[in-house]
Regions:
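Catalytic center-proximal scaffold of phosphoryl-transfer enzymes
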Residues: 1-300
Length: 300
């Protein structure tokens, strides 16, 4: 399906419909349908299966807003929090490096972390997570995510996205050896190998040895590695066949925010922004036709 850039909408309306004025009509219709979608909750469901392994991926992406700023540190952005759920049975291996999720449930909204909890819980139950044999949550290091998970899904397996580990190892090593040092890549590779062998404590010990040399390591060591050590048992996760990266929600988040909400001059208030986010979620989870079929049944 062709998805044209946002700024080309008036020209496309002029070409196909004979007038750019139809763009505003289409906008009103789209936002009206988005209100119906938001009010009716998730539309996509996952096929029920026995002994299912259920994944939840959570992330946040910053979007420019028109909201009043609350101080000099406020850059005029709101966080679009997104939750993606899928079954391990619905992941197809396209290539060695790429997988495709065949069925998924996706919800996103600009809101505070406290009010995203009920949305997260609704997605989990609607998708059938409470029937699964195992529930795995994949996310980055954001504290609001893990606090929400511990409140709502106490027995879920919590996994810190391995790609973030790599990023922080690179940052740590640059502090130790300096930018461009030939020691950086081999050192990072060695720590990755240890983590994939469940030797988290050994990595922490190695980082602690360099604190006197690079005091700035304290922040990375404490706020990332020490606080998330229990979510870094990658050897165990791989043995059990778990995914250890949250690339699906990263990709969805970029499509939700970057393509339609971060263009030149695009600034929204949160209420307006949440409506197109709802439409984008339905489009990306491929439940668009399901929604319209349900509307046709209601109209019959």
């Amino acid at each position: 399906m062709l998805t044209p850039p946002y700024h080309q909408a008036p020209q496309i309306c002029q070409t196909l419909l004979g007038s750019e004025r139809h763009a505003m009509t289409l906008r009103r219709v789209a936002l009206c349908e988005a209100e119906h979608l938001a009010a009716s909750g998730p539309h996509q469901t996952l096929p029920p299966r026995e002994h299912d392994r259920f994944y939840l991926e959570v992330d946040g992406h910053m979007c420019p807003t028109r909201e009043p700023k609350h101080g000099p540190e406020d850059q005029g952005y709101g966080e679009a929090k997104a939750g993606l759920t899928f079954s391990g049975h619905d992941v197809a291996e396209v290539s060695k490096e790429r997988h495709e999720i065949l069925h998924k449930v996706l919800q996103a909204q600009i809101t505070e972390s406290e009010t995203f909890g009920p949305i997260f819980d609704e997605v989990y139950h609607h998708a059938g997570g409470d029937r699964a044999a195992e529930v795995i949550v994949l996310a980055d290091e954001a504290g609001w995510i893990w606090g929400m998970v511990e409140d709502l899904l106490l027995y879920a397996v919590q996994i810190l996205d391995f790609s973030y580990i790599k990023q922080y190892l690179w940052e740590a090593d640059k502090l130790i050896y300096g930018e461009g040092s030939a020691f950086v890549a081999p050192w990072v590779k060695g720590q990755e190998t240890l983590l994939l062998e469940d030797k988290v404590e050994q990595v922490l010990t190695r980082l602690e040895r360099f604190l006197d040399l690079a005091p700035a390591l304290t922040t990375i060591l404490h706020y990332f590695f020490q606080q998330n050590a229990s979510r870094m048992r990658y050897g165990t996760y791989c043995q059990r066949g778990y995914f250890i990266g949250s690339g699906a929600i990263e990709s969805a988040g970029k499509q939700l925010s970057a393509a339609r909400l971060k263009g030149p001059g695009m600034r929204w208030n949160s209420a307006e922004l949440n409506l197109p986010l709802t439409l984008h979620c339905v489009f990306l989870e491929q439940s668009w036709q399901t929604y319209w079929d349900s509307q046709a049944l209601l109209a019959a």
